[in-house]
């Protein structure tokens, strides 16, 4: 028997070659994709902490909590704080702190008095407590010690015979006028200023015998009238009036200067 001829296979048309629409993903696949995205974000934020060459974590100051171990409280202070302390508290080469105010006592201040009791006092008159008296004594002693330290550092001036100099030129032998008083009042200063012996510039009496060589008798009379002179310059003294005055020619006048141009 003759073999049966198979019909030719039809060629696919362009309409038949189009891909079929894919089925919609199931809800489980959607949840898996979301989980993968969240894992990527977590891996981005949970990356390894960047460290310095010394091993310390890098802190950029963005407020993000570092995953490193918490810092111990017993960690030594940073170098910046130590430098600030060194500059704020200078010291001498010997190690002692300088005292820029010698009059102020370096001893600790006395403790404040206790607050008054709330209970009513039975006695109307209260006797002074011994603490106040001791406090006044301590303050007085510190004041004297400060003055003694100042006197040791700044010795007082003395004359070759051992006496203290008298800058006010007073004949009084009291100790008040021997040296400048420490706590002098305004009235005392005024008295010393008004005293003619205390003035720095004294009136100098001119000798009339030195003016006998003057040419005019009128000048001699002027010198006798101005017997006292307190100036410090010769040009302001009465003797400057005795100098010969220059004479100027009033007839001819000033010489006429010749100009370079000629009048034609």
UniProtKB/Swiss-Prot annotation:
Keywords, ordered alphabetically: Cytoplasm, mRNA processing, Nonsense-mediated mRNA decay, RNA-binding
Compartmental location: Cytoplasm
Principal localisation: cytoplasm
Highest taxon above the source species: Eukaryota
Segments of skewed composition (Polar residues): 83-92, 248-264
InterPro entries to which the protein is assigned, alphabetical: PNRC-like_rgn
Pfam families: PNRC (PF15365)
Compositionally biased region (Pro residues): 108-118
One GO molecular-function entry: RNA binding
Intrachain S-S bonds: none
GO CC annotations, alphabetized: cytoplasm
GO biological process annotation, one example: mRNA processing
Residue ranges of the region described as Disordered: 1-180, 193-264
Keyword Phosphoprotein: no
Residue ranges with Basic residues bias: 63-74
Biased composition, class Low complexity, residue ranges: 119-134, 161-172, 208-226
Recorded family membership: Belongs to the EDC family.
Function: mRNA-binding protein which stimulates mRNA decapping.
Protein name according to UniProt: Enhancer of mRNA-decapping protein 1
Organism: Candida albicans (strain SC5314 / ATCC MYA-2876)
